[in-house]
Amino acid sequence: MTGIPLTFELTPTGYDGSSPFPRPATPARAGITPVTLTAAIVIAPFLALGAGIWLAWGVGVSLTDLLLAVVFYVVTGLGVTVGFHRLLTHRSFTARPWLRAVLAVAGSMSFQGNLIDWVAVHRRHHAFTDRPGDPHSPYRYGTGLGGRLRGLAHAHLGRLFSSEPTSATTYAPDLLRNDPAMLRISRAYPALCAASLLLPFAAGWAISGSLYGGLTAFIWAGLIRIALLQHVTWSVNSLCHMIGERPHKARRHDRATDLWSLALLSFGESWHNGHHSEPSCARHGRSGRQIDPSAALISLFERLNWASDVHWQPPDVLGHHRTVAGKHTLRTSTPRQG
C-alpha cells in the first residue's frame, strides 16, 4: 500500500493568539437526537458513580469489581492511547494487522466515538492547535479569565454538544479509502460499546455466581470505568493546554503543557507539551523520569516483533513531521500488511 500524504492547511497568519476565535456565520447546533445520545453517554456513567458510592457505603466494594474495573480501564485506555492515538492518528509505529485490529477494538470500547471520527478530530486539533479551526481548544473564547473558564468547559465537555463536523474525508482519508479493517471496526462502534458494558456484567456474574455480582461489576467495571476514562481523556484536551509546564518548544500559539499528576491515569498522554513538540514520536514522556506506559507497551510490541518502524527520537529538520510553507504534515509511513 502506498502512503497517503496527510497535509492540512494551517490558520492564516492574522490570528493574534489571544482573541476569541471567529464564530461561524451560521452557528450549527446538534439536533435533539445527537444531543440526547451524547448526554446519555456522558451523564449515565457519571451518575453510576453515585450508585457505586451508595453501594460501597453499605456493603463495600468487592475485590472482583475493583480488579475487573482496573482490567477494563487498562485495556480500553491503552486501546485509545496506543491504538487510536499513537498508531492510527500519528503513525508512530506500524503494527501487524491483527494487532491493529485488537487495539482498534479495545479503543472503540472506551465510549469516545468511532475510531475514524476520533482520528479525524485529533488530526484537525494538531493542524490548528489553539487557534481558529481547533475543535477543542480552551482558548476558543479568548485568554481573559472569563474566556478561559468558558473555553475550559468547552474543551473538556461542551464541544460534544455542539455540531462542528470534522471531515473524515479531509483528515482521515487513509482509513476511509485504504483500510477496510479499520472501516469495519469503525462501523461496529455501537456493538462494541454494548460489549464494553455486557462483558463486565458477564464476568462479574460468572466469577461471583450471582446476578448481584454481575450488577456491581456492570456499575464499577462498566459505567464508572467509562466515566473515569472519559474524563481523564478530556482532561488532556482541556487541562493539558492550560495547567502545567511547557519545557519543549512547539508551534506558534500552541499552549500544550506537561501535567505530571495525570501521567499514570492517562498512560503517558498528559506529557502533552512533549507530544506537541514532536507528535509522531512514540514516546510522549521525553525523559526517563516521565512515566509513559503507552510507550512501554509499544516497546514491548517492538521486542516481540509485533511492531516495527517505531519512531522513538525526534527527527532532524528534514524529518517526517514538520511545518513547511504554512502547511502541517503528518508522518506517512505505511502500515505493514503482513
Region annotations inferred by a language model:
Residues 1, 275-276:
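Short conserved micro-motifs at the rims of enzyme active sites and ligand-binding pockets
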Residues 1-234, 239, 281-338:
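Non-catalytic, topology-defining segments of multipass membrane proteins
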Residues 92, 242-247:
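Helix-loop boundary elements of multi-pass alpha-helical membrane proteins
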Residues 172-180, 245-271, 278:
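Active-site-proximal inter-transmembrane loops
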